[in-house]
């Protein structure tokens, strides 16, 4: 917790709730008759409502992207290193919006919410949601806030997929798209990782087919194992080696199945901590949304054809040691955009952190992001004049 709020922090922020009572048709064929989205804003919306930036979160992210909820907070929002006065996403220039997506477990309508038609928690009956559904709901939030066009939409990993979908679905509603450490669709290996994660949850005897709250239970073992698996894929081999190597907790082998290597202790801690803040049904939903995303399926697998609908400029960023969403996956998008005749910039950043590098304030990464968004801000100033 900070003794004093840093000068480059957005400070103490209060989440807001947007209630929607117009039904939202979902890709799965079901609909939500009503729902709510929790969100935070940083900075000030200008008179023409032209300086807004939307932040789209990754699998385990939420609406709390920057600042603090209270002075007692142990840490700031998940992307505080990038959002704030004078930072890469400069709140002196932009009005920044971050939300928790539908199906989430941090305040937006999801499996832990009450189904208004039954008066009971949704739990396993909450419908499958997709990236397309999220973007539709985000557009409704923009309407509510009086924002017709975003200056930029920014997202990393699964968040980057949402940005890509925005450029296709609502091409006139964003001027710039920033897609970081993402992909045009999941690889077979990534789908496999997600299935192992889901099976670890489903096979936990405390899962109760997704209705664990009604059974006064939580599938902590399964969810913790899913997080441990995911965490390994978010880090590079070099990063794990540098952090832990073969460090042990004892002077010699114990010849049992307890914790011996420091990396084992770390993974167990990460898994256990995750179960205290995240919902297993939400984790299942988020991984399915990842699996289903494939915009090129609309155009017989031709990514450049579907991206021809986009009208914004693009910035793509990848990281050299990211093997979950490798640089080659970003380059697929870049090449498709070039083929479609779109304006695109691309930066491959040297980084040791693996996929999680998109969350770190790596100097060249922050410079690339800041330079691109400064150009966006300057263009806004010129247009206002």
Curated annotation (Swiss-Prot):
The active site is at residues 157, 322, 355. It catalyses: L-homoserine + succinyl-CoA = O-succinyl-L-homoserine + CoA. InterPro entries: AB_hydrolase_1 (IPR000073), AB_hydrolase_fold (IPR029058), HAT_MetX-like (IPR008220). Its EC number is 2.3.1.46. Keywords: Acyltransferase, Amino-acid biosynthesis, Cytoplasm, Methionine biosynthesis, Transferase. It is found in: Cytoplasm. Homodimer. This is Homoserine O-succinyltransferase.
